[in-house]
Amino acid sequence: MKTIGMKFKKLLFLLALTGFNLPLSAHCPADYLNESQEDFKERMQWFVDAKFGMFVHFGLYSSLGGVYNGKAVDGYAEWIQSTADIPSAEYAKLIDTWNPKNFNADEIVKLAKEAGMKYLVITTKHHEGFCLWDSQYTDFDIASSPVRGRDFIRELSTACKKYGIKFGTYYSIIDWHHPSQERNSNGKDSWGWWAQIAMRPGKKAEYVTYMKNQIKELIENYDTDILWFDADWVDWWTLEDGKDLYNYIRSLKPSIIINNRVAKRALFTKDFGTPEQEHPDEEQDHVWEACYTLNESWGYKMNDHKWKSAEDVLSKLNEINANGGNLLLNIGPDGTGTVPQESV
């Protein structure tokens, strides 16, 4: 035993001489949930200083514009599959006609830059499950659409670097297209506003692996600075699921910033809070960002003309910033990829 111990010490000595470092994380994985306050403040500083960002809602739903079978559908346009109760197989056919040939990442990011925005967040995968990037884990993505050969997430990531804008990616926890999930209604009623889509028995682990693989793509292939989650409300997604995902993401890119919807938002404050279409009227004890639409819908809705004035937007920005928050202001390009003039 003594001989083995001496040999081991000699091995460590030789490794040190050659500059070889044993990977500490292989034995003691970092718990990013318990980072020091000093490290947290340093990581979050650019975000706190940013004050103003652009949200972009874009997907297959953009081609419908809030209208299905010739009828205007109430509610947010990006929820039309739920509110119009469109069967998954029928909705998936939109990929064959979705042709946003006018989508111009450079112009969108330039618009953000000229407005004084410091970061941009794009819906890489909304609840519908369609992916705006070429993902190796699904065919329900841009590579299977009429604009195959383009990758809007890569185009936006590149443009953000060009203009000095931080790049963020929205990713929905639920997925109306993925086979692991099914509508939890009787087949006659709408899914309902919150779309409590059910997880099929025994399929959750498979879907979480799918999520992690796609998130890894967004980090490693597109160098996202922010991961902006949504749909944490479903029963099958737990606080512990969110904490595990948070640690996984930070292990891939320790400097990344993640919103509180990665877990149960009411119980989780890291890295920043996300009030929606409202904002607190006093300073908070945590980092926060309020997201607002320019009209009423997030995704493009052709019959939604209730646009906020420039004065309204400036007033909100000043109120939010005065209380230590950021404003994430949304635009929704139409089905051709064109940004409505009212948003400009």
What are these regions (language model features)?
Residues H27-V344:
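Mature catalytic domains of secreted/periplasmic carbohydrate-active enzymes
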Residues M1-P29:
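Bacterial Sec-dependent N-terminal signal peptides
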